[in-house]
Every structure is written in structure tokens, then in C-alpha cells.
Amino acid sequence: MAAKIRRDDEVIVLTGKDKGKRGKVKNVLSASKVIVEGINLVKKHQKPVPALNQPGGIVEKEAAIQVSNVAIFNAATGKADRVGFRFEDGKKVRFFKSNSETIK
């Protein structure tokens, strides 16, 4: 099955501590998890690695979020939207369900 949320899509968080925030999808881990830029930040206690000249400390990084907790952001309407699929010129493309506009 084709993915409704892909890398570099702008998404909006629907639930959780970051509800309402928008960000760009950095990575799709599996069919059910994505990493979004600036969303779901966690603190990681990092040990120093002298061989790589990396200092230790507490580092903030993005953690994975369930794909069901995000929705694609439609810039034309300024709201979260749903994704549909259709065939155009023999290719399967994604489109916004609210205004039938093709997603890049």
C-alpha cells in the first residue's frame, strides 16, 4: 500500500503535548511511525566519545510519533487534510480530499 505521509511533507500534530504544531517529516520509520522536525523533542543523555571528539551531555532530539497522530497540512486551506489516491496519466498520485488538489 502506498504511504499517505511521506518524507518532506508538511504535517500538523493532532494529539499529544505538541498538538497544533506544524513541522516537516524528516524520516518515515515504518508504516506507523514518523520523525517530524521540531516535534516530540526528548532529552537524551549522551556519553562522551573521545575517539570521535564528541562531548558528553544532555542532547535534545526528535523522537518518533505515531502516523495516526499527524495529518498532512494543506497550505491552500490552512488546515489539516486527508489524503486520497488517484491515477493521472497512468501514475498513482496523492491528492487533498478537501479541494482535490494534487500533492507535489
From Swiss-Prot:
Q: Work out whether the entry's keyword set contains Glycoprotein.
A: no
User: From the UniProt record, which GO molecular function terms apply?
Assistant: rRNA binding; structural constituent of ribosome
Q: Which GO terms describe its biological process?
A: translation
Its Gene Ontology cellular component terms are:
ribonucleoprotein complex; ribosome
UniProt keywords, alphabetically? Ribonucleoprotein, Ribosomal protein, RNA-binding, rRNA-binding
Q: Which InterPro entries match?
A: KOW (IPR005824), Rib_uL2_dom2 (IPR014722), Ribosomal_uL24 (IPR003256), Ribosomal_uL24_CS (IPR005825), Ribosomal_uL24_KOW (IPR041988), Translation_prot_SH3-like_sf (IPR008991)
Determine the domain of life of the protein's source: Bacteria
Similarity comment: Belongs to the universal ribosomal protein uL24 family.
Subunit structure comment from the entry: Part of the 50S ribosomal subunit.
**What protein name does the entry list?**
Large ribosomal subunit protein uL24
What taxonomic lineage is listed for the species of origin? Answer: Bacteria, Pseudomonadati, Pseudomonadota, Gammaproteobacteria, Enterobacterales
